[in-house]
């Protein structure tokens, strides 16, 4: 293929200087390509010649790689190049065609000359090259003269795309006071032009706005600080405009820009400062502990955690600053001054403290800027209030003997007015704490006396509340809690711990221990109890039993002689005198009940003469009550069951009376089936019957007359009734025999195993047949009104048949 100049354009085409330069470069490339032979891989005609044989003239393609400039704006199609076959002699017998990307739409070929033109405006940024295939055919026969050859049309780039920043918006940050040259961030632009062709995609960066504070690397786009004194407190945000220019920044290059937001972050370079050097507050002397006196806040120009601070109180000498403490509000960073001791206007009216604020986090890099703390003076004035009287002490313990007479002095309480006026005080007892008014108080002196008799055993302690109020202002009221302990006196005699009962065998030995006795005393002497046991003075000795004081507040009872006879005496009563140690000494008498019982050889009690002893020994009163309750519950359950059963029986009997007129007849006669077949000999079904032998047969073999149906008298039910005599079984046998003979003689009778349905239910029923066929007949003149008299259960049936009959007769009337 012989190349044609690709720059052959019409003279009237108007081109820009840049386009003319590019076309000139393209023309020089084509001239150089024409002087160089095409590679063997791009000459398919050689392969075809080898296939046709050695006697044929060698032919092949002559062609070049084509180029076309993008963004062509001319009005005529742009000449791309020419394809040509060596066999083309210029007589028009060869037809050139192309196929592939853009063939027939973007690229058109002259079939006679092989000239290719571009008809559309191309954009290299959308598609860089097009791959097509060329064919040369005989115009007359459409025979392929050369093998199909592939070629490429490349779109040549021009600088028509400006740089773009694709990853915006850009936001960076840098700490304040950072040194010069500190890297902030990097921005990068992209250019859609061909980076391998010319300088259309070579970019350089520059700062359009903000160059006083920041710089940018021309090649990498890294933004750095230009000054070392960036101060967030002066300016927190900077808007820097960065520009990217292609053609390596040369004249005529295209450019694009973006805005970069740079935020200056805070560092702790500012100490806290109090807006004023003295603060004054006032608080009432009655303020409780924990009351907030006031709030003070030190200002800090920093932000975030750099403003976190703590506060401390430092007391001035003798100023009473220990009455307050300071806490820090973590949300507002305020100092809260709080009362931590009770204030007293009369003792100190003004408190002065030094409040100090300091940062929590101090950056050592800025230690040379000074101390990161500040101080202020805080003065707190205590204001006077009318306070209620004060008890001294506010609570106390009093003691009184339980045998004290009414009006006896228990103790004295004292209260005074803490105010400077020192008004007189009046006293009273809060009756909610002394509902029974056991104690009284003198309103002027505060002396507490007994108002009623005391009993330690009933109430050993009393807690009362005493009120103190100003004489002329009862609203100023204070309270004091008093605990009064009742001291014990020996006013209760000792008693046996329980009503003792003992048992002794008839064959007991002398000196055998029967019972150990202990006592109780409601009193509580300071030195402890000491009890003494002896027999009553009326019977200082007992011939049967002896009493031994063990001297540990218990006593033991022993037998005096050998054996007892319960036939003569089965119960002995032994009175025992118990005396306490006083003072004064008190005593009481208790009785030990001793029962004589029969024992076995091992000494185990077998029986005693009284069941009371057994009950007392084995069952407590609570157990007896529980036993009685159980018995009562069982009796109630039995009565309830009997009542329910009687009620159930009465209900059943009423149902029986109501259904006395209901008669239900059920017929379950269903002959045939497999059971009947198994019960009979099947050979009998195949045997022939001699009708002549049954009745009216001709012994000569004449035709037998058909069997006659039984008369109506034979179908009547047999008479029955209570006065009927004992039936004759021969009558039944004759009746059954006749029925069997008739059935055997009837040719229409089905086999034994056939299913038979008998709708006839016998004569004598007032309602006649209840067959569905018969009862549904409209011709029946049966009157079913009598069904209503049979009770509630037959009323729906009577209404059904009565209504049906009425519907049938309605048209006739």
Curated annotation (Swiss-Prot):
Residues 34-621 are extracellular. The keyword Transport does not apply. It is found in: Cell membrane. Residues 643-813 are cytoplasmic. Residues 1-33 form the signal peptide. Cadherins are calcium-dependent cell adhesion proteins. They preferentially interact with themselves in a homophilic manner in connecting cells; cadherins may thus contribute to the sorting of heterogeneous cell types. PB-cadherins may have a role in the morphological organization of pituitary gland and brain tissues. Three calcium ions are usually bound at the interface of each cadherin domain and rigidify the connections, imparting a strong curvature to the full-length ectodomain. This is Cadherin-22. It comes from Rattus norvegicus.
